[in-house]
Amino acid sequence: MKPSERRKARHCATQAIYQWQMTRANVGDIEEQFKIDQDTKGVDLNYFRDLLFGVALHCNELDKVFAPFLSRPLEEVDMVDKAILRLATYELTRRDDVPPRVVINEAIELAKAFAADDSHKFVNGVLDKVIKTLNKR
């Protein structure tokens, strides 16, 4: 598998997680609709599925990991930022095959692609603190 396939999986998963956060629709339905509506060529679909279902299943647990490092209440965090933080925290806590620096770099790129102008700085700061508490340097 190429790194770009995982990057594309993260890209797609961020969009699908955002949709799930907004609608709370069935994750399996979101996955199927996403595969129909989006170009998934070159996407690691197994990784996409793991990220989407993993974040949905462990959402509250993931929030508890990064919420202490937020500068505002979780409810006030932009939904795109929240999707990225949940995805990255899932990778940091549940995917030992991905180095922490890769997780942070990918999250920064997702924030640059999808979120507000300075969101990448916010995401970087929160995840850096998460890594320190997980002792994953």
From Swiss-Prot:
Pfam family, one: NusB
Gene3D superfamilies in alphabetical order: NusB-like
Protein name: Transcription antitermination protein NusB
Organism: Aeromonas salmonicida (strain A449)
Presence of keyword Ion transport: no
A GO molecular-function annotation: RNA binding
GO cellular component, as recorded: cytosol
Function text: Involved in transcription antitermination. Required for transcription of ribosomal RNA (rRNA) genes. Binds specifically to the boxA antiterminator sequence of the ribosomal RNA (rrn) operons.
UniProt signal peptide: none
